[in-house]
Each structure stands twice: as C-alpha cells, then as structure tokens.
Regions:
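Beta-rich, blade/repeat-based domains predominating
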Residues: 1-8, 37-51, 79-94, 121-143, ...
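Short loop/turn segments that connect beta-strands within beta-propeller blades
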Residues: 25-29, 66-70, 109-113, 154-159, ...
Length: 280
C-alpha cells in the first residue's frame, strides 16, 4: 500500500482471474495497493471499523484485513465448497457468508469461531447477501427446477429464512444485495440482452420483506455487473466479461443511465467490490 492509504477511503475490487484484490483511493480512483495470495477471490464486505473481509471462493475461506492493511488478521474456514459473498451486520458485527453449492448461509457471530448454518428455502444455489440497517439479512439465489430467481429474508432474531415473492418486475439472474440507505437493492446480472452479446445489468430497489419493487436502475453500457457497491449517490460495478473488456464502472445512483467514469487497466475477471471508509 502507498503511504497514506490508511487515512483515505478505499475502493477494493477482487480480480478473480489474477487471484488478487486491488485497492483504490475513493472517490479519486487512484491505485494505492494490491493484496495477493488468494484462491479465487470473489465477494468483499466491510465492517463499521473499515476492516474488510474477502471471500476466497476456492480456498474455501474468508480472510480479514485492516483498512489499508497488507497482512491478514483473521481467517475463517468455510465448511462448504464454494463461498461467494459476504455481509457484516452493522449492529452486531456478525458476518454472513453465502455458499453457492450448498444453497445456504453461514453466520459467524461477531465474525469469529464456527458458523451457524441457515438453509435457503426453494434455492439450489445461493449467490449474494446483504444486511439492512435493522440487522435483517436478505439473500438471493436460483433454482434450476423452474429456472427461477429466489429471494429470502432472515429477520433479526429469527431462526430460519422466509421466501419473499417480489412483485413489480422479473429478475432474470441473481445479482448483489445491498442496503442503500432506504431500500434493499437487488441486482439483476441479466436484465436485458445487448447487441454485443452480453447482458446489460440493472439494480432494483425493493421494500425488502414487503416484497415490492419500487424503482429500477439500469446500468447502461455494462456487460455483467456481479457485485456492485453503492456509496451515496454513486454505484460502482465490476464488469466481468468472458471475451470482452473487463473494467470497473461508475454510475449515478439511483438514476443509472450512462457510465460516468471507469477504471480499465489491470483487470482480469473483476467480480467483487466494497467501499471501506477510513477510521475516524
């Protein structure tokens, strides 16, 4: 990390193809460091201290770094086969990690020790998770039986997930889940097909447990936005394209539309992202 990185807000991006995580000053977008030694890094999440957790998809484990740090300070071993994403409860510090193949979520109390496992009803594969400001956990997934999107909630203090049927639009493929300050934002990686052969992505603002989609943010010019990050009036999206340009794009939020700016150098399969705010 460059000198001064620990005092700046940082954007972390997992670069799956090169088994590394890149750190940029935010909002400036200047590369300030690189973390290496991963095995398929995917999801990234930050806690209220600014520490980050990185999901090692083929590790399989989840590793923690201090804000701007270069040494691992904790490792949690995932008992499943393929962890994908994570989220930290802002109130308790609990860490939730989704496991793709087992279609469940592991929750580590206070981000320590062994997890408690929660199955996702009706889901064959689990993708992304996100806590809201009340400590309710939302997860999306997919079922091959009906080729359908699955959305579920683990209400704070409850022992099992409840399936939520979203109304107002069809989500074609699970994208990231994040609390945006007002709504539970849910991504659709395959919102619509483009002439270039890729799927333009979108983000839906939902009422969470209420099951209603109230707004849509189209990420114009995208190819496949996997794990976006919302920070204020900006959404940042790693754009993973098998045979195209791999970049990180910035859009206005919740307006969406045209790309405002981009980071284009040094990416090979960018997937996860998170904003880590500098400790006060």
């Amino acid at each position: 990390m460059t000198p001064g990185a620990t005092t700046q807000d940082l954007l972390y991006v997992s670069n799956y193809g090169d088994n590394e995580v890149l750190a940029y000053s935010y909002p400036q977008g200047k590369l300030v460091g690189k973390l290496t030694g991963f095995a398929g890094p995917e999801g990234i999440c930050a806690d209220k201290k600014g520490d980050i957790w990185i999901v090692n998809h083929t590790g399989p484990d989840v590793v923690e770094y201090k804000h701007g740090g270069t040494k691992r300070i904790a490792t949690l071993h995932d008992r499943g086969e393929s962890p994908i994403s994570c989220s930290v409860d802002p109130a308790t510090g609990d860490l939730a990690v989704t496991d793709f193949n087992l279609a469940d979520v592991s929750i580590y109390a206070h981000a320590k020790g062994s997890p408690k496992l929660y199955a996702i009803p009706n889901s064959e594969w689990t993708y992304f998770c996100g806590y809201d400001d009340k400590g309710n956990l939302f997860v999306d997934g997919w079922t091959g039986a009906t080729l359908g999107f699955v959305f579920a909630e683990l209400p704070k203090g409850k022992k099992s997930f409840t399936v939520i049927h979203l109304t107002g639009a069809i989500i074609y493929f699970p994208g990231n889940v994040q609390w945006d300050g007002k709504h539970v934002a849910v991504g659709d990686e395959e919102y619509q097909h483009t002439p270039s052969g890729y799927y333009e992505s979108a983000i839906y603002q939902t009422t969470g447990a209420g099951g209603k989609i109230v707004h849509k943010t189209v990420l114009s010019g995208s190819g496949d936005i996997v794990e976006f990050s919302i920070e204020g009036n900006t959404v940042i999206g790693p754009d993973f394209q098998w045979e195209g340009a791999n970049s990180v794009y910035f859009w206005s939020y919740p307006a969406g539309g045209k790309i405002k700016r981009s980071l284009k150098k040094g990416f090979s399969e960018p997937i996860g992202s998170a904003i880590s705010l500098a400790p006060n």
